[in-house]
Amino acid sequence: MKFRRVFVLVLLSLFLVSCSAGKNEKPVEETAKESGEGAKRIGVIQIADHIALERARKGFEDEIKNTNPDVEIISKNANGDLTVVPSIIKSFQDKNVDLIYAIATPAAQGAKNGEKEIPIIFNAVTDPESADLLENLEEPEGNITGVSDYFSIEAQLEEMISIFPDIKNIGVMFSTNEANSKFQIEELKKAAAGFGLNVVEVGVNNINDVSTAIKTIEPKIDIFMAITDNTVSSASTIIAESLKEAKIPSFASEEGPVENGILISAGVDYVDLGKKAAGMASEILGGKKVSEVPVVFSTDTRKVVNKKTADALGLSEDDNLMKDAKVVE
């Protein structure tokens, strides 16, 4: 009888231990899931596929992973199709992202129009105000701030004239669909007038118009300037080849088009801009309000020359062109 009672007590003890272990297992599982909730999730939207925007994305992603190793990045590319931007923003909302990184003006505008609460960091936007992204650069209102790729047009023209002192007519192409580009054209006209230079402009609706457009202005220009325009950047190889055949030098505001054949750039570094955006994102993910993170403008610039294009134009021995330049083949 005593043995039976002891046996029952042992079974009861084992049962209680088992129940206790079962209760402990569930909280351990929930804790593991909750640890995942601490990892931040960022939605990245890139408006088109060209070197400058790729660099702005890579600079951001590399830097944000360096400072936030557990961050999850969901990257989407609209491939130049503005109609898919709303659905990309919706997909970020469905994924409950903590922050949106929008690369280029149309991506930033789409993000702002589609989302009013999730913090948005833009990049590769020349004039955030004329793009209607915000009004206060120092204390951004709403949920959006970011990095501007604006670089002084006057400084670029000074560099251009120092290399090509005899130029009179500057050719420029722009997308009629980008407010960013229209702003740059107006700035260029004002600055060029101060140097006694004339601007010959041509607008394009899409990349299919580029070949014809560049041919129409080549007889009228001494040099071509590639502004930071998504259509122009995407078609920079086409533009560069046409200009080389016409023996017309070309100038860009950033390095990407130079890798595609444009002669020279003196302007911003988009990898650096991406890193700056990542720093802003880290501040916001760390608890800062968007209004406490002012818009950033680049102060770092560099000169890059395409060696093959310089050779084709007979300029590879030009000291003014090659001085202090990074050379790409």
Label each PLM-derived region with a short phrase.
Residues 72-94, 203-217:
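Structural motif
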Residues 15-18:
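C-terminal motif of bacterial Sec signal peptides marking the signal peptidase cleavage site
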Residues 42, 60, 145-192, 294-309:
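An alpha-beta-alpha
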Residues 34-61, 67, 74-83, 177, ...:
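Extracytoplasmic "Venus flytrap"
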